[in-house]
Design a protein with these regions (language model features):
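Gly/Ser-rich, acidic/histidine-flanked active-site/gating loops
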Residues: 1-47
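Glycine-rich, small-residue loops and helix-cap segments
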Residues: 3-6, 20, 79-193
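Short helix-loop capping/hinge segments that flank enzyme active sites or metal/cofactor-binding pockets
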Residues: 32-102, 139, 145-148, 178
């Protein structure tokens, strides 16, 4: 059953053909934040075997069978192409420009124009992190080659209760989540598991 049919079955009124406005996207912003936040999280938990992004990269470099099923492109890009701090002038300027475009000229204009409570996007979208608006990604199914995919629910500023209700209702109706399979992996050796 398609994700949109599940939503209709749950009572959603769908508005089709709402094209997301072109949002200025600079993925380096997300990479800066990813590295900074991941390092901050890892450093606060002494039980974890890896305490930095670099240590995770080194671990998977030494143990590719344990976790390289999906590659390390984003990890490497964040580690080696950003400082890991959000004080770089380029980061600050790019983030401000992206947020202006995504907020007033982008998502809010689209949601107001179509009277939307929640915007639903197939897969992962960068419109929410760029805008700073709340979002939730929930499982929606699997591709023909058994790769999981989800739908992203994006809300208006401070609309978390509405967003959570919509995403939770969909998730309960779709029942698309499957526990991950760790074939032949000793989870005691994988950081964070």
């Amino acid at each position: 059953e398609g994700a949109y049919r599940v939503m209709e079955r749950c009572g959603a009124i769908l508005v089709q053909d709402t094209n997301l406005p072109h949002l200025r996207s600079d993925s380096s912003i997300l990479l800066y934040e990813f590295k900074m936040c991941l390092n901050a999280y890892l450093s606060t938990n002494p039980a974890l075997k890896c305490r930095t992004l670099k240590e995770i990269i080194d671990f998977y470099g030494d143990h590719p069978k344990e976790g390289l099923k999906y590659g390390m492109g984003i990890l490497l890009d964040a580690e080696y192409n950003t400082s890991g701090t959000c004080t770089d002038p380029k980061y600050i300027l790019d983030k401000a420009a992206c947020q202006r475009g995504a907020q007033e000229e982008g998502l809010l204009k689209l949601m107001d124009g179509h009277k939307l409570d929640v915007l639903v996007c197939p897969g992962i979208t960068d419109c929410s992190p760029i805008s700073g608006y709340p979002s939730i990604i929930v499982p929606a199914g699997y591709t023909s080659d058994n790769m999981p995919f989800g739908v992203t629910f994006v809300g208006r500023p401070f609309s978390e209760p509405t967003l959570i209700r919509a995403a939770y209702s969909f998730e309960q109706a779709a029942r698309a989540r499957r526990a991950p399979e760790f074939e032949g992996i000793n989870t005691d050796t994988v950081p964070g598991i």
